[in-house]
From Swiss-Prot:
Gene coding for it: ilvD
Chain ranges passing through the membrane: none
Protein name: Dihydroxy-acid dehydratase
UniProt keyword terms in alphabetical order: 2Fe-2S, Amino-acid biosynthesis, Branched-chain amino acid biosynthesis, Iron, Iron-sulfur, Lyase, Magnesium, Metal-binding
Similarity section: Belongs to the IlvD/Edd family.
Domain of life: Bacteria
Keyword Metal-binding among UniProt keywords: yes
Enzyme class, UniProt record, top EC level: lyase
Length: 619
C-alpha cells in the first residue's frame, strides 16, 4: 500500500519546521492527515484562453476541501502563440512546453503533493502539464478553460462566423477595405477561451478526453457557458476519490500511466485523425508518450492515418464550423462513439470518470442515449455577448445536430474522406517523416509537383510572399526553423495565411522543418525530419529543384539524383563550423535560454523531447 507522499512533510517530530510552514499557509492539525492536492492553474492576463482562470483554481480548491482534501494552488506560465506569432517571440513557444512540464514537476515534487488537478487551456500549456503528469505519475484530472465563442460579423449584408485566422488573412488581402479589416479584427475573438476552431489548444483539450484524463465535454463546452462550471467542480471531487483509491486501497489503476497506455494513445491519435486536429498534436502526443514510457512513434501514427477516416471538419478546414458546433453535435464523445461503431476504438480502457471508455460512451454519446440531461448538456450554445468572464451565460440551442450523414460529425460510412485528417509523408526530403493536415488540403492538390522556392527563415518567406516572389505552382521551402535550427520550431501561420490572401492557398505547397499553427490550412507540410540544422536533406534543396508530393501514396520526394545530393552534402560538410546553418546570418537574437533548449532538443519525429544521452558522463 503506497503512503501518501505528503506525509513526508506532515508527519514525524523532525518535520516540525515543515508543519510550521504549512500552518502559515492556513493548515490546521486536522489537515495533516488529509491528501494534499496541487491545483495547477495557468491564469494570466496575457492570454484570452487563460484570462478567466483567476478564480477557478480557488473554486476547485474549495470543492477539494469539501471532499476531504487539502488544496494548494500554484500557476504556470502560459504563452499566447497568436500574440507571439510572426516575430521572435515565437521562438519561445515550443520551449515553454518543457519549461511548464519542469515547473509542475518542481512544485509538485518539492512539496510532496499527492495528486493534481491541472487547469490548462492553450497551445503549450495542456501538453506541458500532460508531460508533467505522466512524468510524476500521481492521480490527476485535467480540466481546461474551454473554447472561445466564434466571432460573428456582417460583411456585404451577410453574417459570417469568424476566428483569429480570418483576421490575419483579411489583413493581408487587398480586396478588403480598412474598415472591413477593422470590423473583422474587432469581431474575430469575442470572448475568453481558446481560439474557436480546431486549432492546437482545442485539439489537445479534446485529446485529453480520448486519453481518459479529463471529463466528457472538456474539449468542446464553451468557456462562457454555465455548464462548464460543473466540470471544474467534478474534477475537484474526483481527484480526492482517486487519491483515496490509490493511497488507501492500493488501486494503481487510477495512476495516469495506467490510464494513458499505448492503446489510449492510439485512441487519442485516432480521434485526432478523425477530427482533423492540429499537426502540433503529433509533436505533443509523441512527447507525452515519451514521458509515460510508452513506445508510440511516427510509424504508429502513419499506420493509424491509413485506416481512420475523417469524420469532422472544423475551422480552419471548414471556415463556418467551430467548436460550439462540434459540441452541439455531441462533442468528442460523439466522435469517439462513431469510431467505436466502426471498430476503430479501444473502448475497454479506464478513464478518470468511468470504469471504461465504453461505459462513458453509453452515457455520453448522444447517438446511443436518450438521457435528457446529456442532451441538454450538448445543447449549450454561445451567448453572443463579448466577455472575459467564465460561466457567464446559459443559452441553449433549440435542437441537437444528430445528422451523421451530412452534419458536423459523420459516421464512418458517410465520412468526409476515407483517409483521415492527418497523414505522415516520407521520402528523401524527410527520411524520418513529416506531417500534413489533409483535412485542410484541397482535393485538387493532394498530388502536387513544383519547383522549390527556398527561404532560410520564416521572415524571409513572408517577405517573399508579400512581394510577389512566390508564384502559383511553387513549393515554398522554409528551413532552419526546426527545434534546433530556429531554435524553437516556429509556427508558420503567417506564411500560410499570406499565401491564402494572395490567392495561392490552393496553388502552392509549403514544406518546412518548422511547424504550423492549428489555424493553418492548405498544402502545408511541416515537421520535416531530420531538420536542416541536423543535416537533413531539406538543407540541400536549391531553388528550382523539383519536389513531388503525393499524399495518397504518403510520399514527398526531391527529384535530384542521389549522386548530386551526395556532392551537395560533401560541399556543405566542407564548410566546417558553418555547415548546416543559413547561408547568411539572420537578424535573430538567440538568448542563453534558447541556446540551452537547442543544445538538448531532438527532432520533431521524436516529439522534440530532450536528448538525455548528452548528459551521460557529464558532471
Amino acid at each position: 500500500m503506497p503512503s501518501y507522499r505528503s506525509r513526508t512533510t506532515t508527519h514525524g517530530r523532525n518535520m516540525a519546521g515543515a508543519r510550521g510552514l504549512w500552518r502559515a499557509t492556513g493548515m490546521k492539525d486536522s489537515d495533516f492527515g488529509k491528501p494534499i492536492i496541487a491545483v495547477v492553474n495557468s491564469f494570466t492576463q496575457f492570454v484570452p484562453g487563460h484570462v478567466h482562470l483567476k478564480d477557478l483554481g480557488q473554486m476547485v480548491a474549495r470543492e477539494i476541501e469539501a471532499a476531504g482534501g487539502v488544496a494548494k494552488e500554484f500557476n504556470t506560465i502560459a504563452v499566447d502563440d497568436g500574440i507571439a506569432m510572426g516575430h521572435d517571440g515565437m521562438l519561445y513557444s515550443l520551449p515553454s512546453r518543457d519549461l511548464i512540464a519542469d515547473s509542475v514537476e518542481y512544485m509538485v515534487n518539492a512539496h510532496c503533493a499527492d495528486a493534481m488537478v491541472c487547469i490548462s487551456n492553450c497551445d503549450k500549456i495542456t501538453p506541458g502539464m500532460l508531460m508533467a503528469a505522466l512524468r510524476i505519475n500521481i492521480p490527476v484530472v485535467f480540466v481546461s478553460g474551454g473554447p472561445m465563442e466564434a466571432g460573428k460579423v456582417v460583411l456585404k449584408g451577410k453574417e459570417v462566423a469568424l476566428d483569429l485566422v480570418d483576421a490575419m488573412v483579411a489583413a493581408a488581402d487587398e480586396k478588403y477595405s480598412d474598415e472591413e479589416v477593422l470590423a473583422i479584427e474587432q469581431a474575430a475573438c469575442p470572448t475568453c477561451g481558446s481560439c474557436s476552431g480546431m486549432f492546437t489548444a482545442n485539439s489537445m483539450n479534446c485529446l485529453t478526453e480520448a486519453l481518459g484524463l479529463s471529463l466528457p465535454g472538456n474539449g468542446s463546452t464553451l468557456a462562457t457557458h454555465a455548464d462548464r462550471k460543473e466540470l471544474f467542480l467534478r474534477a475537484g471531487r474526483i481527484v480526492v476519490e482517486m487519491c483515496r483509491r490509490h493511497y488507501e486501497e492500493g488501486d494503481d489503476s487510477v495512476l495516469p500511466r495506467n490510464i494513458a497506455t499505448f492503446e489510449a494513445f492510439e485512441n487519442a491519435m485516432s480521434l485526432d485523425i478523425a477530427m482533423g486536429g492540429s499537426t502540433n498534436t503529433v509533436l505533443h502526443l509523441l512527447a507525452a508518450a515519451h514521458e509515460a514510457g510508452v513506445d508510440f512513434t511516427m510509424e504508429d501514427i502513419d499506420r493509424l492515418s491509413r485506416r481512420v477516416p475523417c469524420l469532422s471538419k472544423v475551422a480552419p478546414a471548414k471556415s463556418d464550423v467551430h467548436m460550439e458546433d462540434v459540441h452541439r453535435a455531441g462533442g468528442i464523445m460523439a466522435i469517439l462513439g462513431e469510431l467505436d461503431r466502426a471498430g476503430l476504438l479501444h473502448a475497454h480502457l479506464p478513464t478518470v470518470h468511468s470504469a471504461t471508455l465504453g461505459d462513458a460512451l453509453n452515457k455520453w454519446d448522444i447517438a446511443r442515449t436518450n438521457d435528457p440531461e446529456v442532451q441538454k448538456f450538448f445543447m449549450a450554445a454561445p451567448g453572443g455577448v463579448p466577455t472575459q468572464t467564465a460561466f457567464s451565460q446559459a443559452r441553449r440551442w433549440d435542437s441537437l445536430d444528430l445528422d451523421r450523414i451530412s452534419g458536423v460529425i459523420r459516421s464512418a460510412d458517410h465520412a468526409f474522406s476515407k483517409d483521415g485528417g492527418l497523414a505522415v509523408l516520407s521520402g528523401n526530403v524527410a527520411p524520418d517523416g513529416c506531417i500534413v493536415k489533409t483535412a485542410g488540403v484541397d482535393e485538387s492538390i493532394l498530388k502536387f509537383s513544383g519547383p522549390a522556392k527556398v527561404f532560410e527563415s520564416q521572415d524571409a518567406a513572408v517577405a517573399g510572399i508579400l512581394t510577389g516572389q512566390v508564384e502559383a505552382g511553387d513549393v515554398v521551402v522554409i528551413r532552419y526553423e526546426g527545434p534546433k535550427g530556429g531554435p524553437g520550431m516556429q509556427e508558420m501561420l503567417y506564411p500560410t495565411s499570406y499565401l491564402k490572401s494572395k490567392g495561392l492557398g490552393a496553388a502552392c505547397a509549403l514544406v518546412t522543418d518548422g511547424r504550423f499553427s492549428g489555424g493553418t490550412s492548405g498544402l502545408s507540410i511541416g515537421h520535416v525530419s531530420p531538420e536542416a540544422a541536423e543535416g537533413g536533406t531539406i538543407g540541400l534543396v536549391e531553388n528550382g529543384d523539383l519536389i513531388n508530393i503525393d499524399i495518397p501514396s504518403r510520399t514527398i520526394t526531391l527529384a535530384v539524383a542521389d549522386s548530386v545530393l551526395a556532392e551537395r552534402r560533401a560541399a556543405m560538410e566542407a564548410k566546417g563550423d558553418a555547415a548546416w546553418q543559413p547561408a547568411k546570418p539572420r537578424p535573430r537574437k538567440v538568448s542563453v535560454a534558447l541556446q540551452a533548449y537547442a543544445a538538448m532538443t531532438t527532432s520533431a519525429a521524436r516529439g522534440a523531447v530532450r536528448d538525455l544521452s548528452q548528459l551521460k558522463g557529464k558532471g
